[in-house]
């Protein structure tokens, strides 16, 4: 059975970039909704004992076909948001670990180029979805987009950071100004925490 992960910080901790009300609704309503729905689906399948969301998403086609879309949406939503909120955790956000920095420079040229790629990808998403920095087994670090709540894990990519461009992530503060939200998210992003995610993925 899955549980809503604790944020580990207050809802207003990401101000002024993302407002407290948005953070509260996003975490306690949307993220929690994916948790509750995922548990309900697993219970219906007699799989409530499953607790590794990565394995669920990687092996989604092993589940009955009538449940696969529900699993994709809700296991994806759970996994995506868990990483999203983790990487917004306050801290030494400009502390990019040396190995991660070297690999970013090798793949993109610089951190600024990576940020520009993420922003461009986020802005090109039509409707709802996510812009991702992922580690691809064949080609290393790359920026991709995924629609809706689809997880990079379904494609054997390892997610490092994700920008949620569903309107629920920003509409209270930014309305239709997605570009301002994306800029704000990149300013709020804790690169030390993202570096820790990267270390976990490569080790």
From Swiss-Prot:
Record field: catalytic activity: 2 superoxide + 2 H(+) = H2O2 + O2
Gene Ontology CC terms: cytosol
GO molecular function, one term: metal ion binding
Keywords: Iron, Metal-binding, Oxidoreductase
InterPro entries recorded: Mn/Fe_SOD, Mn/Fe_SOD_BS, Mn/Fe_SOD_C, Mn/Fe_SOD_N, Mn/Fe_SOD_N_sf, SOD_C_sf
Disulphide bonds in the chain: none
Recorded coiled-coil stretches: none
Cofactor note: Binds 1 Fe cation per subunit.
Induction remarks: No inducing conditions were found; seems to be constitutively expressed (at protein level). Part of the secA-sod operon. Expression is partially under translational control of BpuR; increased levels of BpuR lead to decreased expression of SodA (at protein level).
Tagged with keyword Iron: yes
EC number: 1.15.1.1
Any one Pfam family match given in the protein's UniProt record, by short name: Sod_Fe_N
Binding positions for Fe cation per the UniProt entry: 26, 81, 164, 168
Cofactor(s) in the UniProt record: Fe cation
SUPFAM superfamilies in the record: Fe,Mn superoxide dismutase (SOD), C-terminal domain, Fe,Mn superoxide dismutase (SOD), N-terminal domain
Subunit architecture: Homotetramer.
Family named by the database record: Belongs to the iron/manganese superoxide dismutase family.
Function per UniProt: Destroys superoxide anion radicals which are normally produced within the cells and which are toxic to biological systems.
Protein name: Superoxide dismutase [Fe]
């Amino acid at each position: 059975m899955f549980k809503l992960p604790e944020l580990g910080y207050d809802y207003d901790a990401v101000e002024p970039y993302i407002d407290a009300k948005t953070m509260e609704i996003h975490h306690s309503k949307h993220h929690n909704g994916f948790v509750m729905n995922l548990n309900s689906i697993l219970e219906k399948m007699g799989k409530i004992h499953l607790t590794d969301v990565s394995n669920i998403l990687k092996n989604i086609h092993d589940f009955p076909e009538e449940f696969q879309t529900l699993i994709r949406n809700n296991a994806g939503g759970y996994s995506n948001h868990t990483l999203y909120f983790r990487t917004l955790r306050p801290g030494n956000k400009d502390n990019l670990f040396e190995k991660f920095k070297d690999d970013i420079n090798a793949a993109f040229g610089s951190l600024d180029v990576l940020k520009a790629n993420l922003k461009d990808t986020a802005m090109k998403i039509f409707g709802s979805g996510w812009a991702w920095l992922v580690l691809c087994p064949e080609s290393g670090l790359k920026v991709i987009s995924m629609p809706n709540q689809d997880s990079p894990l379904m494609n054997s990519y390892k997610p490092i950071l994700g920008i949620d461009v569903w309107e629920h992530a920003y509409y209270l503060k930014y309305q239709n100004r997605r570009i301002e939200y994306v800029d704000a998210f990149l300013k709020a992003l804790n690169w030390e925490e993202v570096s820790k995610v990267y270390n976990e993925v490569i080790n």
